Amino acid sequence: MRKLFTSIYLWGIVIISFCSHTTNAQQLLNPRLQPQFVNQLPVPGVINGLSGGTFNINIRQFDQWLGLVDPITKQHLNTTVWGYNGSYPGPTIVAKKDIPISVYWHNNLVNGSNQPLPHLLPIDRSIHWAFGHDPNWQSYGVPVVTHVHGGHTESASDGLPDQWFTPDFAMKGPGFIKGDAQPFYYHNDQEAATIWYHDHALGVTRLNVYAGLAGYYIITDQNEMNLQAANNLPAAPYDLGLAIQDRMFTSSGQLYYPSTSEEEEEEEVPYPSILPEMFGDFILVNGMTWPVLDVEPRQYRFRVLNGSDSRFYNLFFSSGEQFIQIGSDQGLLPSPFTTNQMLIAPGERKDIIIDFSNPALWGQTIILKNNAKTPYPKGSAPDPLTTGRIMAFRINKPLDESYPLTTLPATLRPPIVPLQTELAPRKLILFEAEDEYGRLMPILGTVDDGILGFRDPVTENPAMNSTEIWEMYNETMDA
């Protein structure tokens, strides 16, 4: 053990070996024996909220083909997943600035007899989670609550971890306010941006999202619509989301989430046990393993989301093609900029343009690759044959001249006025401590107070409409 910060003792990062295809007596699919760049990129359906309205979105369990095959028979292997409105990823919600929408999120994780379904993945009940140590927890069903990540949302509709609920609202978290009698309300009072929605239930967020509960939430505004109308930005069908996620699968094609580490197998820790980080050995984009997209010789807009648990991606093209970044988490950049590679962290979004119009690309297949280490930035390099590959693009479709070509402008938005503040910066710290079982535990704190738990009194209470500077100090081994 090494003392790193104010009496905090840190473990070395737990790194799980995924070279073996047997984990805890569970046979796993070998990613090297699965097809790549054969199956077309799926495009989720759309919920059109441009004119406002109230929508019902159902969370259900179903089987979906994610591109997996039996390595011997080559027969398709379907995977049981969860999704919104029967889709993984969920449908893309499209809204417009200052036009609110309301959503009833229905927890329909029940069987044909309307009985609650068990979770698809092992739950560690030793951590702070929805049902605590209640011995009857399995009879209640799976807790869920949806959070719009990046949205400017009222607290009652924010999908806070304690706002969870089970099927038919039989059980509700202590923070539950809306969902049954009242829908979640989204003001959409922010500029055009690529944000996303995902489950956020206490203690099982990682598992519920891994099971499939995520989707895009796109906000547009008049500035962006003007750019599209002037053919300065690609619009549908040349405006697509790319949600990148890593997963592991059993030999029968079912989702697998590690529930103990090699280090913990010889120690007295609960089983199943939470892990501080999880890195899958399959890469999926929009719910398909290593897909391909056939494209025309023109500009495409891709809204890239890193929907993985812990994995960073440093993206680059096998052909050396460049990315033109036009937006980030919260909206359009002041002007486009060009780069040969693009780093994207879990939960982050990057809005990019790829120009396939170069005549030298016609008839070619180019591969989107990844070279980010796991854990980032000091861990192991990805397998160049699996996790080092994301998807492929085939430049083989004839140009559809009914859609005009686009030309990026020099500026994308009005200038951003720098914010000023005379308030002292708030200084917060990211720690890695140990829990009562000796497991690595990411946790927050402040420079003045050190480590703070979930139930500790609030320390950061900025005034409404104030401007502050928050300084984040990373004391973890990944820094």
Mark where each language-model region is.
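A conserved hydrophobic secondary-structure block that centers on an alpha-helix together
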Residues: 171-208
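Bacterial N-terminal signal peptides
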Residues: 9-18
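N-terminal signal peptide c-region/cleavage motif recognized by signal peptidases
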Residues: 20-22
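N-terminal, post-signal-peptide metal-ligating segments of extracellular/periplasmic oxidoreductases
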Residues: 25-148, 152-172, 181, 266-302, ...
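Short Pro-Gly-centered flexible turn/kink motifs
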Residues: 101-103, 175-183, 345-354
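Short, acidic/polar linear motifs in exposed loop/turn regions
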Residues: 109, 205, 308-310, 476-478
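Bacterial N-terminal signal peptides that target proteins for export
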Residues: 1-10
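Histidine- and aromatic-rich segments of cupredoxin/plastocyanin-like copper-binding domains
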Residues: 136, 153-170, 244, 248-252, ...
